[in-house]
Amino acid sequence: MQNKITIEECQKLLEQNPFGSLLQMKITEAELGRVKAELPFKKEFTNIYGDLHGGVLYSAVDTICGIAAGTYGYYVTTVDGQIRYLKAARATEYVTCTAKVVKPGRNLTVVAFEITDANGML
């Protein structure tokens, strides 16, 4: 990819990822080193309590972080990840996952992320 990143390019990357496409996310913003996407709240993504399952949230941010890192033109794969669940993602239309590259690199890229609900909380 070039320095000019489009939503369409990032959406195409997302849809080419067989696992990532299962999440049915929609890229809403994209620029070099930063991607924002909406993850729909679907019954199939919930845990026994009706909240979004933590594994689904982790998978969503892992996928979006990979796309954000990939905007620099490198093939990427996750080597390490950490997430802290501060609040349950309760029934809402969608949650927003925002990934921002903190330190780009050819061999290792560091990406931070944030998850919010439709009200900007979580």
Segments the model singles out, each with a brief description of its role:
Residues 1-122:
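Terminal targeting signals and extreme-terminal segments of soluble enzymes
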